[in-house]
Each structure stands twice: as C-alpha cells, then as structure tokens.
A protein has these predicted regions:
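Alpha-helical scaffold/interaction cores of sigma-54-like transcription cofactors
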Residues: 1-617
C-alpha cells in the first residue's frame, strides 16, 4: 500500500465505530499495510490490544488520540496527536488523563483539552489538524454549519472564505507554537464541503497529508454505524449529528493507490518503533513505615515463621514427607525470586493480616490453594501437599503449583503475575481499600475500568429495539433468544471458529446450527445482521468489581486515567488484562455477600453460645 492510515477510530470510540481491533489488524495484514494508527475519541483504551495484535502481524503500531479542544467559551475543534517516541507516549497519557479529569469530566461527561496547557506535554508528539470538526474547517468557511450540511460543491465554494489561506495559516501557527511537528490534513470525501476544502489545501499547500477519518472496514457497516449514531441522538440530544460518507469512513473502500498517499510516509518517518510493555511496578513492602530493602529475604523469613507455626508447633509433618515440603518451598521461593515478585506475596499477606486483625472474615479461592507459600503466609487455608488432612499423603493428591503460576510464560520482556482472589465482606471493602491507599499512597492506588459489551442475546434484543421499535420487538427477541444454545456448551468450538474469523460469535453459530433460529434469520435478516456486527463491541463504562492496581509510583505517569461517576474518583482507563501488560500490579479484592452473611451468622450464634469459628461454617 502506498499510504499509512493515520486517523482511525476503533470500537473504543464507544458507540461511534464498528471497527473491532481484531478485525482492523486482520484487514491491515491482508492488505499488506506495514504501519497504521489508532486514534480514538479522547481516550487510548485500545492501545494494548492494538499494539499486541499489530506487532504479532508484523505491523508497526502508531499510538494516537483524537482530542476535543476547548477554550473558555466552549468547544473549538478537534486535533489528532500521534506519538513519535516513548516521551510522546508518556505525554499523551498525561494529556488524555487531564482531559478526562474530575474537574472537567464530572461537569457534563465530556473530555476537554486546552491548548494553553499543552506546551509542557508537547515533546514527542505530532499534531494533525484539518478534518471536519477542526478549527481549519471552521475558520475556512464563512458559515461552517451551512457548508457542513450543504449537498452542493458550488454552494460550498461560495461559502469558502476568500482569505481562507490566511485563516488556515492562523490556525496552523497557533499549534506550531506548541508542537514541533504540525501537519495539515484533509479527507478525500464525498462530502461537498470537504472536497472544496481539500482542493483549496492542495492548491495552497505543498506539505499536507491525506488522512481519511476511518470508522469501519466494510461498506455493509455504513447503515449499522448510521443507526448506532441516530439511536444515540434519539437518547441524548447532545450527541453530535454525523453525516456518513462512504469514502470518508470506510477503510476497505480506500483505493490501493491512494491519491498523494506517499505523503503519509513523511509522518511515519518521524515515528520510532518503541515498546510500551513494562515490568511489574510492585511497591516495596514495608513494616511500620520502614521499607524492607530485601523483599526476597523477608519472604523467606515469613515462610520460616509460617512453617514453624503450622508444622513444628502445630500439626507435625510425617518425617517421611518432610523433604517434599522443603523441596516445594525452595522451588516456589526460587521461582518468585527469579521473577522478582516476592513483594507481591508480602503485600497480599499484609492485606490478609489487616483484615483478620480487624476481626473480619477473609478467604482466598481458586488456584492460590496450589501454592504452598500462600498456605505458609495464611493467604490460603489449604495445604496443597495434603489438601485433605484426613487422608495420608499421596503425590497424586497434591494440588499442582503450575495451576497457580506458570513460570514458562515469563521472558526477558514480560513477567506474569500471580492471581490471588481475596474475598471480603462488601461492607468492609471500602475500609480495606483505604488501608491500602494510606499505606502505599493515594496516587499509587486506583480502581480499574471495565466495559459492558453487546453479548449474543443482548445484541439481538438491542437490534430489535433500534430497528423494529414499532413492532412487539421485546417479545419477538425473547422468543428467538430462548432458542439459543448456552454459550458455555460450545465455548471451545467458538474459540476454534474465531481463530479463522475473529467476528464469529454466538449469533452466527445459532443461525448456522439451529434450524428454528435460521427461519427467524430469514424473516428478520436486517435485525440479525445488525446484531452480528455489534456483538462483542464495548458499549458502557463501569468499574471492575474486584481489581485494584497498587504501584510503586504515581499511576498517572504510567496509565491513562478517567473520572468514574460511580466512585467519584479517578480510575485507570485501561482494562485489567491490559493494565498488567503496561506494568500494573493487580490485586483482586472482591466483596462477597455470602461471606458477609456467614460472618453475621457467626456473630449471632456467638452472642449466645460462643463456640463457632467462621472458618468452620
């Protein structure tokens, strides 16, 4: 291909793009692109999946973002920033986090960036300006709204200011005073106003960049994208009206020989191929505000104490199997020391001890019971070598350590973290999180964002609501979805099918395999096709139920942040699995209602009888 896509919105521009990251990268690889960008609206949520998938296909990922620019009087236009290097990447994180800060995002849910504050964050960033919502468009036309809505090139030519070049130069000079690299760009679009503006730019400027504003891959997505936008407008009048134009938004319809496409390589030449993956930022654990410098040695000390309490003072280990225990402990300690994650266990142990010290119930579940060190530290209540103490020791009954931690995943650039789920009473969770914040610093601890997605049945119901509102859509959708096979029963088959086609989902499987669903598909093809395209796309923001990131440094320097109305605080604007790729250390502290009830029952009984222990309920 003779060009680089530099202005691309994926599904992480929530409800404004049908472009799934898998689908995007797959298309890039098929068409032979060597580099491409991701530039979602006011966020970089998709940077990790895009980076990883692009790298896997041999495509250079360009990290960027489209920002809404404001001044004291309101919205003024949009710019697109691309990261030249790691410095620019860090600066973009800071800019996006400021745009979505409590002071701005809380007011009306809109991200706001001010040019006056960008000078200190401009290093390492490329600025692109010139699309439909930019100050270039607004300043070039005498009546930009009329030009935007016009279907006549002749009318738009009349509306184009005679001094449009001077007006554009004023906009460019304003941004050139902040950024070293500023490029004027325009869309090759069927929109008359953009065609007129594009011709004017080509006539007056040599250094411009053709840069279409991509929102989807397939032409079939045009009406789907249009319906999503119109549905938002119906629910929220504040959502911008957007006119959909084939050549402007659709990646697959851009020609292989894109006009002046080689000019995009002038931008690519400025961009380094830098890495964003980071090792775990585990805080140094301390006791009584004193940092313990040798985390490995302190973990050994804690393990010795646990061994003494459980197996010397407590239940004796049969002499014949002592070597099994000592060998397992040595092996686990060595693995954690090599991975440099000893501090992780010290932090979890400290949290557990704090909760127990408050007289509250706490439990860990899942694979952590396969770790002997977790048992020695009282994180887990199960001895993995003798999980059933009523039975004699047997190698076959051991809980495998590999189920808990697979050291084979570690390499020179990546260290996997353990996954210990800690369950606590919901009423105590805020207090526990406050303890963690006070110990490691409020700027170093944050919740994580999560996103609800259009799932199979829900996607179909949403499609009926939008496309067939006049019909009895709810009853029809319910009748159809009751015929669906439980997704859990075919999960392995779906994984195999998705390896060949990432967009394959539960709706298509039911159409292909359930005859009664196929009949409904023939009757409501438009609705089903809409549902298939939105299936798995993110739609709403929420807060991860358990995940908490604890770092050795202020999180705002390493992760994009956003305001959460639910918590009334800043949270990390990247999903949990992606946060770990960027060096985040996740601790799962889940409020479990059943635990609360068991604890209340214990207290009620003990008020009368005083012999029940929570751990025996």
């Amino acid at each position: 291909m003779n060009y680089v896509p530099l202005h691309v919105h994926t599904c992480w521009s929530l409800l404004d793009s049908t472009l799934d990251v898998d689908e995007y990268v797959s298309h890039l690889a098929t068409k032979g692109f060597k580099a491409a960008a991701i530039t979602d609206h006011n966020n970089i949520k998709g940077l990790v999946p895009f980076y990883k998938k692009a790298k896997a296909k041999g495509i250079r990922p360009i990290i960027g973002c489209e920002l809404d620019m404001w001044n004291l009087f309101g919205f003024v236009g949009r710019i697109t920033l691309l990261c030249k290097n790691k410095t620019g990447y860090k600066n973009l994180i800071a800019i996006v986090s400021m745009a979505r800060s409590i002071e701005r995002f809380k007011v009306d849910g809109r991200a706001k960036t001010y040019l006056t504050e960008l000078s200190q964050y401009s290093e390492g960033l490329i600025c692109l300006i010139g699309d439909l919502r930019s100050e270039v468009f607004t300043n070039a036309f005498a009546n930009p709204d009329m030009a935007y809505n016009s279907d006549s090139e002749e009318e738009c030519s009349i509306l184009l200011k005679k001094n449009h070049k001077e007006e554009i130069d004023l906009v460019l000079s304003k941004y050139q005073a902040v950024f070293n690299d500023v490029f004027l760009f325009f869309d090759y679009s069927k929109l008359p106003a953009l065609k007129v503006l594009g011709n004017a730019i080509k006539t007056s400027y040599k250094d411009y960049v053709p840069c279409n504003n991509i929102h989807y891959v397939k032409k079939e997505d045009i009406p789907i994208h249009d319906l999503i936008i119109k549905d938002q407008e119906a629910q929220d009048p504040a959502v911008d009206d957007q006119r959909i134009f084939l050549a402007n938004y659709c990646l697959c319809h851009m020609p292989e020989k894109f006009p002046d496409g080689e000019k995009t390589f002038a931008v690519l030449d400025l961009i380094e191929d830098f890495a964003i993956e980071e090792p775990p930022m585990i805080p140094q654990f301390g006791v009584k505000d004193q940092i313990i410098l040798d985390q490995d040695e302190y973990l050994k000390i804690c393990c010795r104490k646990g061994y003494s309490d459980k197996f010397i003072k407590g239940n004796k280990i049969p002499e014949a199997i002592k070597c099994e225990y000592t060998e397992r402990i040595r092996r686990e300690l060595n693995i954690f020391q090599q991975a440099k994650i000893s501090g992780y266990f010290l932090i979890v142990r400290d949290i557990v001890n704090y909760v127990k010290g408050r007289g509250l119930p706490i439990d860990s579940r899942g694979s952590s019971s396969g770790c002997l060190i977790s048992y020695l530290l009282d994180i887990s209540s199960i001895d993995p070598l003798m999980p059933d103490p009523t039975l004699d020791y047997s190698k076959d009954r051991e809980l495998p350590f590999e189920r808990f931690y697979n050291e084979g995943r570690n390499n020179a650039t990546n260290v996997s973290l353990p996954d210990i789920d800690v369950d606590v009473p919901p009423s105590a969770r805020p207090e526990i999180i406050d303890y963690i914040r006070n110990k490691y610093g409020h700027e170093n601890v944050a919740h994580i964002i999560t996103h609800s997605r259009f799932k199979g049945k829900g996607a179909l119901k949403e499609a009926f609501r939008i496309i067939k509102p006049a019909e009895n859509h709810f009853e029809i959708a319910n009748e159809i979805t009751k015929l669906f096979v439980d997704e859990a029963k075919i999960s392995d088959e779906l994984v195999e099918l998705q390896e060949e086609d990432p967009s394959y989902g539960i709706i298509r499987w039911n159409i292909d395999n359930i005859q009664s669903v196929k009949k409904f598909y023939d009757q409501y093809k438009e609705v089903f096709d809409f549902a298939i395209r939105i299936e798995k796309l993110p739609k709403n923001e929420s807060v991860h139920a358990a995940g908490l990131i604890v770092s050795d440094r202020p999180l705002k320097n390493s992760f994009p942040m956003t305001y959460s109305p639910k918590l009334d605080q800043m949270i990390i604007d990247v999903e949990g699995v992606d946060v770990e790729f960027l060096g985040g250390v996740k601790f799962d502290i889940l409020g479990v209602a059943a635990l609360e009830k068991a604890y209340q029952i214990e207290r009620m009984i003990n008020e009368k009888l005083k012999f029940v222990e929570y751990g025996r309920i």
